[in-house]
Amino acid sequence: MPRVKGGTVTRARRKKTIKLAKGYFGSKRTLYKVAKQQVMKSGQYAFRDRRQRKRDFRKLWITRINAAARQHDMSYSRLMNGLKKAEIDINRKMLSEIAISDEKAFGELVAKAKDALK
């Protein structure tokens, strides 16, 4: 069998990697071997941080709810317990948005939570 030279395929594969490395600094952008390593590492970072982002947002929502709840003389854990006992089913994302944008409505939720805890 004759030898098959893979010039076209090799060039296409390398071009794809270099294209993915667009925006990187120095040799990570231009040299194939270094660019390939950095693209692999970037993929690992992206995979990890897609999961990390979910945790970070949940932490942010909880922090915002806690700060708003403490303005109404209540801790975060007591507020969430009170809302659960009052059968108010609202997720943390929406609760944090209410705490930021609508102080009056959040105050009413806190009052209902306090009543449910009594």
Swiss-Prot record:
Could you tell me which InterPro entries the record lists for this protein?
Ribosomal_bL20, RIBOSOMAL_L20_CS, Ribosomal_protein_bL20_C
What keywords were assigned to this record? Answer: Ribonucleoprotein, Ribosomal protein, RNA-binding, rRNA-binding
Keyword Signal tagged:
no
GO annotation, biological process: ribosomal large subunit assembly; translation
**Lineage top rank: taxon:** Bacteria
State the Gene3D superfamilies in the record. Answer: 6.10.160.10, Ribosomal protein L20
Q: Which Pfam families match?
A: Ribosomal_L20 (PF00453)
Q: Where does it sit, as one GO cellular component term?
A: ribosome
Q: Which GO terms describe its molecular function?
A: rRNA binding; structural constituent of ribosome
**Role of this protein:** Binds directly to 23S ribosomal RNA and is necessary for the in vitro assembly process of the 50S ribosomal subunit. It is not involved in the protein synthesizing functions of that subunit.
Q: Which PANTHER family match?
A: 39S RIBOSOMAL PROTEIN L20
> What's this protein's family per the entry?
Belongs to the bacterial ribosomal protein bL20 family.
**Protein's name in the database:** Large ribosomal subunit protein bL20
